[in-house]
Amino acid sequence: MLLRAFDDAVMPLRCVFCGARTREPEKHVCAGCDADLPRIASPPPPASSPFETEVAPLAYEFPVDAAIKALKFQRKLFYAPAFAELLCDACALLPNDIDAIVPVPLHWRRRWFRGFNQAHEIGKPVARYLGLPLVRGVVRRRATPSQSGLNAHDRARNLRGAFVVRRTISHRHLLIIDDVITTGATVRQLCRALRVAGAERVSVLAVARA
């Protein structure tokens, strides 16, 4: 046990998916697992979309779905930097004028129960990678029921008015970060609140699309 702890301290990290040592320092996903991840295209959003760009590099399939659930519901926080690493690789698909990051907020009760906000844990390393600030004062003011199992109409109704921004936003182009996009109801409602607070343009970067 002591020898393995020493090895882990001086050797590269272990892959979060298979446990093998990664060959590159600070890499959380080995080359083999990275090649096997269910990647999908991120086409330009339709003209009716409120977003400048919407990027989700992975499909919500195994092993991505299992890893996201483990992060959120089993407190497997080691997945967060791995997802951030994958999002940093996808940042080349984003516009180059983004000037601040907004992780999707949790209601305070859910965050207290969970102990963390998964979007914030993923968003912090991405913000550091891009050299951008995290926007403060963005709040989920209503404890909405879980979105799981709801159709698109019910998801939108469930989230109506859920977000508020408690300060004027001076940044012109914001990047919302989330773990999964399903119908897009969450990020659209957050986008609406950000625009009311002064944002001119909003893009979205999520780990996966369901």
What are these model-derived regions, one by one?
Residues 1-178, 182-210:
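Glycine-rich phosphate/pyrophosphate-handling loop used in enzymes and phosphotransfer proteins
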